[in-house]
Each structure stands twice: as C-alpha cells, then as structure tokens.
Amino acid sequence: EICACLVGSEMCIRDSVRLVKTAEQMEAAAKLFAEGRRSICAGGWVQEALDALTPEMFLPQLQQEKQEGWVCYLHYTKDVPDATVSVHHKTGQVEHLFVTESARGRGIGQKMLDFARKKLPEHEHPVLTVLNTNTRALALYRRMGWQVVGAKEKFDPAKDPLVVRPSQVLEMRYQG
C-alpha cells in the first residue's frame, strides 16, 4: 500500500493504491471499469451499446483475467475507490486504467500509470492500449514517455451498427 498525505487548505487527504484481493474490491474494480469504458466510448457508440457496459458485464472479465495472470489495483481517496489499473507480469502489459470523472484532474491517472509501470521492472518497454479518441489519456501517456507503435482493432460505423464515429485502438510502448 502506498500512502501520501496531501495538505491543502488545512485538509489532509489520505490516498493509497491497493491490490485487488477481495470480492468487494473486484466488484469495485468492475464498477470503475464500466464507468470508465462508458465515458471513453460516449459519442462513439449508440446508447444501447453504452448501456450494456455494466459492472455485471466486466466482473467476469476481470475474474477471468485474474486467472490468466493479470493483477488489478485500486486507488482510494478517503477509502473510496476512484481509479483502477491492471498489469500482466508475463507480457508486460498495462490495461484498464480508469479514473472516475469526479477524481480527474488531480494527478491520479499519472500516479496509477507510473505505479503500474514500476510494477513491471522485468519489462523495460511495457505496452498498453488506448482508444485514439481518448485524447486526454493519449496526451498523458505521451507526456509520460509512451509512444504509439501501432493500431489494433478498428471501429467503423459502415461495418458495425453500434458504432457512430470511427475510432481505433492504439498500442503504445514505454520508451522512457
């Protein structure tokens, strides 16, 4: 657990990053995952598709990923989970970095990405994926030394009735 005390206008806020171990923590991660995915996909997919992005949809995925070697972490502010990130030690991947809308703009995303990268010391150049329309995340990743190395999945309204705006998943690699 990482703790820090941030002092501003006589108020001390405790924040920490914790390994997801319990069912309650896994459910909190699934809730953040769903909120993050809906936020990122808003404007790019039809409402029906966004409505399907629920914690109940992502909980089995996170549980399966845990079985496959993924490790998930939650960030807490005042004991309330407000961000999540997952890492895979064998492959050097970082995924599922989501910060709640109410917690954005406080450096939590940067802290979580740095935390995740440092959890992979055996991988000099870890990788992550990001939707190209997620410009805020792309800007953060670039500032932190990540570079686009390719495109993966593409979403095309002409080929998928759930998609309303073209986008693609970019792969980024940490270059330092």
What annotation goes with each model-predicted range?
Residues 96-114, 131-139, 143-144:
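Conserved glycine-rich acetyl-CoA-binding loop
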Residues 20-26, 31-102, 113-115, 119, ...:
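Acetyl-CoA-dependent GNAT
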Residues 70, 165-171:
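Short hydrophobic/aromatic beta-strand or adjacent loop that forms the aromatic wall/cage
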Residues 104, 127-138, 154-159, 163-167:
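Conserved beta-strand-loop-alpha-helix junction that forms the acyl-donor binding cleft
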Residues 111-126, 147:
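Conserved acyl-CoA
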Residues 1-15:
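Single conserved hydrophobic/aromatic residue that forms the stacking wall/gate
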Residues 142-152:
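Conserved acetyl-CoA-binding loop of GNAT-fold acetyltransferases
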